[in-house]
Each structure stands twice: as structure tokens, then as C-alpha cells.
């Protein structure tokens, strides 16, 4: 498991989740794992073509997680668009290394529920 935080939809901060960077820092440990953004991911802002659905932020992060065969779990922070988060489909996932109810942005990116209970 890799923990990070405060991405704030920043292209510069996003580079810390680039597979090349993660492999140079953690080797094979960054593959088949969970990468957790602890607050303020910055996804899903209305009328922001970079961070909304179909935007570069979600597309890039989804492709990187797919390449790493990993899942990115975002714990919402105080700078999130909760209206959009709670409009996402709710899914219950039980994987080998985590379980809980999530809001799904994509197959590789999930938001935790507020006050949710999770097993990692």
C-alpha cells in the first residue's frame, strides 16, 4: 500500500503517481497494490475539462493504475466536490487486499464513503 495526499488536481503532483516514478521509488511494490490519496484528490469539478470525466487527470491516472494493475482509492478531503462524488455509482468491493463500499470514478479509481468502514 502506498499513501499520499493533497493532489488538488495538480499536474505537478500527479507525476508522483506516474508508474516510472513509483517504480524508481518502490520497485515492484507499487504493482498489484492500493494507492491511497488521503484527502483532496481534486477530481470531478464541474466545467473543468482537466479534472472532470473524460478529462486528462482521470484518464491519465486510470491508465497508470491499469499499467500497475493497482487501485487508487481517494479519501475525500475538505476540498472535494461532494455533490459529484455522491452522484457516482456505489459499489461494494471485496478484493484480496481491501473491502468496503466505494463510489466508482473508473475501474481503477474509487472514492471512499464518508464514515465508511474499510478493511485493508
Positions of predicted regions on the chain:
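Core catalytic region of metal-dependent phosphoesterases/phosphodiesterases
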Residues: 4, 10-118
Amino acid at each position: 500500500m502506498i499513501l499520499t495526499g493533497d493532489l488538488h488536481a495538480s499536474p505537478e503532483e500527479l507525476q508522483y503517481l506516474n508508474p516510472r516514478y513509483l517504480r524508481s521509488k518502490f520497485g515492484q511494490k507499487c504493482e498489484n497494490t492500493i494507492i491511497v490519496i488521503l484527502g483532496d484528490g481534486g477530481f470531478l469539478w464541474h466545467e473543468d475539462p482537466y479534472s472532470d470525466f473524460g478529462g486528462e487527470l482521470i484518464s491519465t491516472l486510470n491508465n497508470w493504475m491499469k499499467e500497475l494493475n493497482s487501485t487508487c482509492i481517494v479519501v475525500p478531503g475538505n476540498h472535494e466536490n461532494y455533490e459529484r462524488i455522491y452522484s457516482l455509482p456505489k459499489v461494494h468491493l471485496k478484493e484480496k487486499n481491501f473491502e468496503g463500499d466505494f463510489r466508482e470514478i473508473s475501474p481503477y479509481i474509487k472514492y471512499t464513503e464518508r464514515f465508511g468502514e474499510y478493511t485493508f
